[in-house]
Amino acid sequence: PIALALARNERIRLHVHLDERASAFFALGLAKASDRPVVVACTSGTAAANLFPAVVEAWTARVPMILLTADRPPELRGVGANQTIDQRELYGRYARWFTDAPLPAQGPDSMRTWMILGHEAYRQACWPGPVHVNLPYREPLVPAGDPVRLGSVATGFAGVSLGEGPSAGEPDIGGFVDAVAGVERGLLYLGSLRTPSPFILDLATRLGWPVIAEPTSGLRIPGTLRAAQFLLSSEAFLEIHRPEVVVQFGAAPTSRAGLGLVGAASRLLIVDPDDLVADPHGRAEHRFAVHAGQLAHGAV
């Protein structure tokens, strides 16, 4: 039923893969490129388990994905039925949201339930990260009844925006401005960024600070230190040019020299719009869940 529903919807671009693991990584790539949630659907049993490696990658890289796993009905779980495993919370902490959907039924109440479920799955994926919707069916390969017409049920959702994830509250732009006020020898260090922002260079220009961009940042902008890793490996260089404050954008550095710099920083500030925990040394003075563009306009 899942595949039939996807195939019947002309607004959905469908890709068919015979291998579940490959299909999940293909969806991961599409989601990375588009920065929009991509759906990957599969049948029940070990097929769902084959999505796990891509789920971990999506969770780590904060890539929006929606996993639709077909399942057997509740009464066939744990009794040795064919192609059945316990798929509830299958991906553990690597799915940022999970729901075990009800069995399909006819009627407006059921349709409204499914509209709410679909909206919430999309909203949660936009946070971003992988979300898991487990879909039990009594007859997994046989469509039942006529196609559902949403009609008036959908009108209640006409004003709902699907483009935003859960609110994290007001960004603490003033707190960042206060933290960097009066600092002359500061440094912006760019780790892996979910959405690379050219506003980081605007912020660096306003502050008058140098920028180090790791390859994983995805930013190729003028003004960054191209030989930074070599310079950071030199204790003599750091003795003279050690910054007062390091502002880390995104994930923690992947290079040994970069990790050493942020780990030994007198003051470390971490900026990530998703409030990513990226402090392996436990040295962060503060984490700011803000976008670089907001900081660039605030740090005047």
Residue ranges and their predicted role:
Residues 2-75:
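Thiamine diphosphate
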Residues 21-24, 47-49, 72-77, 84, ...:
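Short gly/pro/ser/thr-enriched loop/turn and capping motifs at secondary-structure boundaries
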Residues 32, 50, 174-175, 187-283:
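Glycine-rich, anion-gripping cofactor-binding loops and their flanking helix/strand elements
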Residues 36, 83-129, 295-297:
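Conserved thiamine diphosphate
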Residues 101, 105, 109, 262-300:
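Phosphate/pyrophosphate-binding active-site segments
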Residues 120, 124-181:
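Conformationally flexible catalytic loops at phosphate/diphosphate-handling active centers
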